[in-house]
């Protein structure tokens, strides 16, 4: 069964690995979103609810753009957040940037009237973060593998993220974890409401990760989900 998918991302971030053969243009996060949109719209049964490349929003005010985005998020059931090296402007507050608001709205239960005049409340969206490689092809600005324990584990630099993303990772109520040899904590199972995956892994089997996001959503009561911006 197809799902309605919204994608949240930093449009013009160009610190990404090149994936096109057109050397006269610069690949950006939007280049990856185009690939994702193509899969959602043409290969899968899903419906793409995000912004389309070439869509002219220049004549609209910020309020009008935000209302359009809210309409699309409200009508979606999964929000994919694209993690890229330049996604966050550290000189601006999180609440002055688009992505945190899109995440917050995705997680809230929002009530609206339908065409019959009845109030309909949306559920918190399933969430999935896709990590893009930087221009050097590396993911280590956010994640890398550690081998300090008997079993290799994956390290996430959550301080790199917007606060609302950081709070919704490693936020399971009943924690299954152990102390690693270097003093860090290793988590087992689906410990985060916003799970994350590298682009190269996602694109090989996207449905596996989409299904996992919905599986986690079905157990949302097991997580401390943060929906507001500080």
Name the predicted role of every residue range.
Residues 61-70, 103-118:
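Short secondary-structure capping micro-motifs at structural edges
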Residues 1-78, 198-230:
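Conserved N-terminal substructure of TIR/SEFIR domains
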Residues 85-86, 110-114, 118-138:
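Short beta-alpha junction loops
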Residues 4, 11-17, 133-230:
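C-terminal interaction surface of TIR/SEFIR-family domains
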Residues 14-27, 89-99, 140-147:
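Short, flexible/disordered intra-domain loops and linkers
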Residues 79-85:
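Short, compact, well-ordered microdomains
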């Amino acid at each position: 069964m197809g799902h309605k998918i919204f994608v949240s991302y930093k449009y013009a971030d160009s610190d990404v690995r090149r994936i096109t053969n057109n050397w006269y243009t610069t690949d950006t996060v939007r280049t990856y979103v185009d690939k994702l949109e193509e899969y959602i719209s043409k290969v899968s049964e899903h419906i793409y609810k995000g912004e389309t490349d070439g869509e002219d929003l220049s004549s609209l005010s910020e309020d009008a753009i935000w209302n359009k985005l809210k309409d699309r998020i409200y009508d979606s059931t999964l929000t994919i957040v694209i993690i890229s090296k330049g996604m966050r402007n550290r000189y601006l507050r999180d609440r002055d940037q688009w992505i945190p608001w899109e995440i917050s709205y995705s997680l809230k239960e929002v009530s609206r009237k339908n065409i019959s005049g009845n109030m309909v409340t949306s559920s918190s969206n399933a969430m999935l973060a896709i990590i893009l490689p930087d221009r050097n092809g590396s993911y280590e600005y956010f994640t890398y593998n550690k081998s300090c324990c008997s079993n290799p584990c994956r390290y996430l630099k959550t301080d790199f993220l917007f606060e609302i993303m950081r709070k919704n990772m490693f936020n399971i109520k009943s924690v299954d974890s152990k102390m690693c040899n270097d003093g860090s904590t290793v988590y087992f199972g689906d410990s985060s409401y916003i799970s994350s995956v590298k682009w190269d892994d996602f694109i090989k089997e996207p449905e596996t990760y989409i299904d996992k996001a919905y599986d986690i959503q079905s157990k949302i009561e097991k997580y401390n989900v943060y929906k507001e911006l500080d």
